[in-house]
Amino acid sequence: MADHNGVDRSITAKAMRRDFGELHAVDGVDLEIPGGRIFGFLGPNGAGKSTLVKILTTILNPTAGRATVAGYDVQKQGGKVREAIGVALQDVGLDPLMTARELLMLQSELFGTPRDKARTMAERLLKTVGLDDVDPKKRAGAYSGGMKRRLDLALALVHDPRILFLDEPTSGLDPASRAAIWEEVRRLNDELGMTIFLTTQYLEEADRLADEIAIIDKGRIVAQGTPSDLKREVGDEVVELQFGSCEDAASADDALSAVAPNRQAGGRELRLYFGRAAENVPELVRALDGAGIRLQGLTIEQPSLDDVFLRVTGEALEHKVDAPPPGDDKRAEVTS
C-alpha cells in the first residue's frame, strides 16, 4: 500500500513456506506490515527468522506461498524488490582487500551517485556507524566481527532504500556501538519514513525500537502485536518467587497449580501472572506454608517481553542487551 507520497513501503506474506528436505523452516507464515513501521521479528535459534528474511529479500525462493515487498512480488519482480531495499544479513560479505571508504564509494557509484557525492556519503555513513575514526588504510579483512557488521549496515544505507532489512544488526557489538545503531534506526524511521524489518535476539532492542513484534517458533508465527499489547496478554502484573533449590521451585510449581494456573518455572524461580498480584500474595504464601516449602524471596513487577517469549515458546531467550551472544553455528545460519 502506497503512502501519501505514492511510495509503497509495505511488506506482505501469505501462506509462506520454505522447506529444507523434511524440515519446515518457514511453515505457513502470514504477515502484513504497513509502510513506515519498525517491525521486530523474534524467535529462538532455528525458528525460521533468517530464512524468512532471505525469502523477502529474494535470496531464497519459497517452497510455497506469496510475498510482496514495496509492492513487488518477490519471485516475479525480484529486480524491483532489490532496488527498493537495503539488506544487512548475519552473513557479512565484504571484499577483504578493500577499505571501508572504497567499499562505500563503489557501492554508491554502482547506484549512479557522482564520485564527489559518493565520497561525502561514505564519510557520513562511516560516522553514522562509528567507523569514522578507523585508519582509512585499514582493509575490511582486518576488521573485527563487530566492525564488519557496522560497515555492512552502512553499505545497506547507501542508496536510501524504502525498506531496510536488518538481521540481528547489533549482534556482537559493545553497548555504545549498539546504542548508536539504535539511534540511527530510529532516525531512519522517524525522519525518512523508512520501513525497517528487524530480527533480533535482544528483547530490550525489540521493546525499545519496534512498533509491532512477531514471534516465530518452529517456523510458525505464535504471537504478534505491539510490545505493550503482547505484555498485557500475559497479565497485568508478575509475582516472581525465589527458592533455595530447583527442587523447591519444582515442588512450588505443583503446589500452586490451583492458585496460579498461569505460571512459568525456571531454575530456582517461579513466575506467576495475575491481574492484581498483591491481592494474591497471601494465598500464595499460605499454599507454600501448607506444602512445607520455604520461600526465599518475592517480588512484584510488570510483565516483560521475556515473559511473552517464555509463554509462547516455552523457553527463555537467553541473550541480554548487555551481553553480546556468541557467534551462530552453521545450523542457525540455515534455519534461524
Segment roles from a protein language model:
Residues 139-143:
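Conserved ABC ATPase signature
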Residues 160:
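Conserved catalytic motifs of ABC-family nucleotide-binding domains
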Residues 164-167:
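Catalytic Walker B motif of ABC-type/P-loop ATPase nucleotide-binding domains
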Residues 183-275, 299:
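ABC transporter nucleotide-binding domain
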